[in-house]
Design a protein with these regions (language model features):
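Acidic/polar active-site rim loop that often engages polyanionic ligands
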Residues: 18-28, 96-97
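Acidic (Asp/Glu)-rich catalytic clusters
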Residues: 3-10, 92-97, 120-130
Length: 219
């Protein structure tokens, strides 16, 4: 419906989620989350493209009748962006389905580059061209007439976010089975785990606006 209302300008987002919502709020097994997510993605893609009513009999979802109306304007489907922290499985999912991988780098472009270097290696592994439209990353940017005005406008929000919002109990960040062996082998950490690590070890995370800007978290 949104694609029709916008005249074919919808960009769909398929976030994988975090352990806090999927595992602890909804009681899902962390070992099967990725498989269940992939099944859901396939259901949505088929619903967008299949012109007739169909049945879906998956391992986790069974639907007798699936019939999307109104149908998306964009053919064969709207573009899909997958926001993610850092996992090999998310890279593979994006490359197999021609989705855009959007790295959620709360810790700025320097941290994002480390993750995206791994993503481009995965692109090579899949023998696909390094099209720049395959990837993006989150970067907080404050716009103002001057540097001082930007500090005056955004310091309170930035300091609150990095000083308070990213304090995550490490017990919630990585339940057993949530991170796969393949992801651990390449040394990747999600943004949630990274934030929890900072909280647990009381590292010198930037808490002043000046430190936050100097470390590239906010430009």
């Amino acid at each position: 419906m949104l694609d029709v209302m916008s005249g074919g300008r919808l960009v769909a987002g398929f976030p994988v989620g975090t352990p806090m919502d999927t595992t602890y709020c909804y009681g899902q097994s962390p070992a099967t989350l990725r498989e269940k997510y992939r099944e859901g993605v396939q259901l949505i893609l088929k619903a967008w493209s299949e012109p007739d009513v169909f049945s879906f009999n998956g391992k986790y979802t069974q639907l007798r009748y699936v019939n999307v109306w109104p149908r998306p304007m964009q053919k064969p489907r709207p573009p899909v962006w997958v926001p993610g922290g850092a996992s090999v499985e998310t890279w593979d999912l994006c490359l197999e389905n021609d989705f855009l991988y959007a790295n959620l780098s709360y810790f700025g472009y320097l941290e994002a580059k480390k993750v995206l270097d791994g993503f481009w290696n995965a692109v090579d592994r899949h023998k696909l061209p390094r099209n720049p439209y395959r990837a993006g990353f989150l970067q907080f940017v404050g716009v103002a007439e001057s540097r001082q005005e930007a500090f005056d406008k955004y310091a309170e929000a930035a300091e609150y976010f990095y000083g308070r919002c990213l304090h995550i109990d490490p017990r919630f960040a990585q339940p057993p089975g949530y991170t796969t062996e393949a992801t651990m082998r390449v040394g990747l950490q999600s943004q949630v785990v990274k934030a929890a690590s900072y909280s647990e070890k009381f590292k010198a995370r930037p808490t002043s606006m000046q430190q936050i800007v100097d470390d590239g978290y906010v430009i």
